[in-house]
Amino acid sequence: MAMQKLFTYIYEFIEYRKMVLLEEKVPYDKFVQMVLNTGFFRINAETLNHGIVSVFIFGANGKYVHHGGDMRTLLTNTLNEKKHYEELILIVDKPVLSKKNILDIIVEQRAANPTIVINIYPYHLFCINIPKVSAIPKHKLITQEEAQEFLGREYLQPQDLMQISASDPPVVWLGGRPGDFVQIERPSETAMHAVVIRFITKSKI
């Protein structure tokens, strides 16, 4: 069931982020076959800035999520492809996020590739279309100029704002990064919507 949802919503995620697929969408049965046979399924897409984003969906029992060496080789080979990578998104079963050997590889690769965003997330962030969940208020990234205008008007510094983690589901779907600002519209008793600004901080993983 998780794989079916992942297959559906990962493409909606790519569309929501306004990315363009660099390969044709494969049928679901081929997606499953690749996850089972190779241990992962990869999607390449291009951002509005013409950067490349590679999304890896790893099988729960494949070698890449159990052996740090295999994960290191995969990521190193990927980043050596000489493409203009902007981001790698690794999607794994939640228990993998507690495996030190895998997390150490992520830290290592981030240090070796400081200009590339490398993130690892659990399946459940992509088993639903987060922006369409009615219980979640609308989130929107704002520019640094818009944020500075707000801060100046309110006589605030970024550290004075409430914070939101880069791993928060709506922020993940938006592609927000530490140092960015997000505008959140919440229902209000005195107005149709109350608008708040949050400062995005680094996630724990």
UniProtKB/Swiss-Prot annotation:
UniProt keyword annotation of Transcription present: yes
Keywords (A to Z) from UniProt: DNA-directed RNA polymerase, Host cytoplasm, Transcription, Viral transcription, Virion
One MF annotation (Gene Ontology) recorded for this entry: DNA binding
Gene3D superfamilies from the UniProt entry: RPB5-like RNA polymerase subunit
Coiled coil: none
One of the GO biological process terms: transcription by RNA polymerase II
Localization annotation: Host cytoplasm; Virion
One cellular component (GO) term of this entry: DNA-directed RNA polymerase complex
Residues making up the signal peptide according to the UniProt record: none
Purpose: Component of the DNA-directed RNA polymerase (RNAP) that catalyzes the transcription in the cytoplasm of viral DNA into RNA using the four ribonucleoside triphosphates as substrates.
Record text on subunit structure and interactions: Part of the viral DNA-directed RNA polymerase that consists of 8 polII-like subunits (RPB1, RPB2, RPB3, RPB5, RPB6, RPB7, RPB9, RPB10), a capping enzyme and a termination factor.
UniProt family annotation: Belongs to the archaeal RpoH/eukaryotic RPB5 RNA polymerase subunit family.
UniProt-recorded name of the protein: DNA-directed RNA polymerase RPB5 homolog
Source organism of the structure: African swine fever virus (strain Badajoz 1971 Vero-adapted)
Lineage: Viruses, Varidnaviria, Bamfordvirae, Nucleocytoviricota, Pokkesviricetes
